[in-house]
Amino acid sequence: MASDIEIAQKATLRRITQVASDKLGIADEHLEPYGHYKAKLSLDYVDSLKDRPNGKLILVTAISPTPAGEGKTTTTVGLGDALNRIGKKTLVCLREPSLGPVFGMKGGAAGGGHAQVVPMEDINLHFTGDFNAIQLANNLLAAMIDNHIHHGNELDIDVRRITWKRVLDMNDRALRDITCSLGGPGNGYPREDGFDIVVASEVMAIFCLATSIQDLKERLGNIVVGYTRQQKPVTARDLKAHGAMTVLLKDALKPNLVQTLENNPAILHGGPFANIAHGCNSVIATQTSLKLADYVVTEAGFGADLGAEKFIDIKCRKSGLRPDAVVLVATIRALKFHGGVDVKELNTENLDALEKGIANIERHVANIREHYGLPCVVSINNFTFDTPAELKLLQDRMAKHEVPVIVARHWAEGGKGAEDVARAVVEIVEKGQSGAAGFKFVYDESLPLMDKITAIATKIYGAAKVNASAKVAGEIKKLQDAGYGHYPVCVAKTQYSFSTNPSARGAPSGHTIDIREVRLAAGAEFIVMICGDVMTMPGLPKVPSAEKIDLGDDGKVVGLF
C-alpha cells in the first residue's frame, strides 16, 4: 500500500494559474506565484470580492481524538472533492501545518491517502514562509522589549512582569523556561523568559482574526507585553514595534492557494493549534473562500469541544461567520479507544468497548446541536478492519438521535468515497435545515470571565465546576476590572478528553476544570485560560517523526505521512 507521500509524489498537478483560472475565475494578475503549484492571492483582489454573495460554510470537526488523529483534514479534503464531483463549486479552506508536529508525532498535516492537498512536501515544510514571518514578528517585539530596558527603560517596564515570550516553530521542551541576557552588562538585564511554539503565539491568533492589513496593525499595537512598576500595561504600540511587525507580515497576510489531488482549489492560511490556541484558519481566508465558491469546507482543530467551540465563540463572534452545517468525523477505532481498549488492540472487533465509547460521540453530537444550534452529519473514516457488526452498532445507536451516520472511504477512493457525505450535507443546506438560523454561542459576551469558562466547562465538557487558586482568581478579577471582561475565553487544555486529564476517556462527567494560568491576549481580543498540565511549548515524543524523514538519492523527500 502506497504511503501518503508516495501517492502525493505520483499525482499529476496542474499549474496553480490554471487551477485559479479554470476553477475560480481568477486572472493571473491577481496571483503571486511561489513556483508552479502554489500562489498567494493579492490583498487588492481579496478586497475586490467584498460585495459578492457568500457561499455555504461547512465546518468539519471530530470526536475526542486518539494520538494518531481521526482524519479531519483528510475528511475536509475528501468532502471538498466529493462536493465538486456532484456539481457543487467548492473550495477547501485549511490551516497550514506546523513543523512542530510534522517532526514530532504526526509527520505531516496535509490530509492522507487520496484526499490530500498538494504539493504535500512544500505545504508541510516551510510552505510560503508565513509561519517564519509570524515567528519573526513575534521575536522582533521580544527583542525590542529587552532593548528598551537595556537602553534606559524609559517606560519603566518591570522585568518581573514581562508577559511576552519568544516563539519557535518546533517542539522543544528545553526552551519552555530559560534565563536570558546572561554574560555581562553588554547583554542586557538578566531575567526569566521562555519560548512558546509559534502556533500558540498571540501574533498567530491576531494574524488569523484580522480582517485587513489595517486591522492587523491596530491589533498588533494593542498587544500587552508586560507591566510597569506601577502595574500599568505596556503595549507594542508603546514600544513603537507594531509598524515593523506589520511590515514583516504584509505578504504573509495574503491567502495561499494550492490544489487537492483531484486538482480542485484549496486555500491554506494560518495555523493556530486548537488545544493551546483558537484552532482555526484565518478569517481573511474563510471570507475570501466564501466569495469564490458555492460551498466552503473548513476545519477546526481537534475535537468539537475545542476547535469547534472556539470556531463558534471566538472566530464566528469576531467575524460574523455562521456555519450552515457540521460534519463530525469519527472512527470505530477511536470509539473503541474511548471504551477502554488499548491502542495495540484497536484493530480487533470489540462491541462491548464500542458500546461504551459511543458516549463520546453522543456528547459531541449533543453539544453541536444543543449548544451550537447546528445540524450535524457523522462521517466515519473507514478502516479495512472495521467490521459490519461494529458499524451497525454505531449506526443503530445514532439513529436514536436522528443523526445520519455515513461511512466514508475518501482515504482510499478520493472524492468518490465521500459522495454520500457530500449529498447528506447538501440535503441539510438546500432543504431548509441550514444551521445559520439556529446558530448560537455557548455564552453571552456580557457575562463575567469566570462565568464564561464555567459555561464552557459545564455545558461542553460535562464538568461540575471550575476551580481557580486565589492567585489565578485574583488575576482574572484584575482583567475583569481592567475592562477586558467582554472578551471571549480561549481554553487551553488536553485534546484527548472532555476533562483536563488526558487519560479520562469516553464522556467523563462531574469533574473539576482547574485553571492553572491566565494570559491576556489584548490584540487578539480574548483571554487564554490554561487548564490542567497542557504546555504551550510541546516536546518531541520518544521516537519523533524526524527520525524517519530524509532526502532520498533521487532528491525526493521520504518519511512524511
From Swiss-Prot:
EC number(s) per entry: 6.3.4.3
InterPro entries from the UniProt entry: Formate_THF_ligase (IPR000559), Formate_THF_ligase_CS (IPR020628), P-loop_NTPase (IPR027417)
Keywords: ATP-binding, Ligase, Nucleotide-binding, One-carbon metabolism
Gene3D superfamilies given in the database record: Domain 2, N(10)-formyltetrahydrofolate synthetase, Formyltetrahydrofolate synthetase, domain 3, P-loop containing nucleotide triphosphate hydrolases
Segments crossing the lipid bilayer: none
Catalytic activity: (6S)-5,6,7,8-tetrahydrofolate + formate + ATP = (6R)-10-formyltetrahydrofolate + ADP + phosphate
HAMAP family registered for this protein in UniProt: FTHFS
Name the record gives this protein: Formate--tetrahydrofolate ligase
Organism of derivation: Methylibium petroleiphilum (strain ATCC BAA-1232 / LMG 22953 / PM1)
Gene (UniProt): fhs
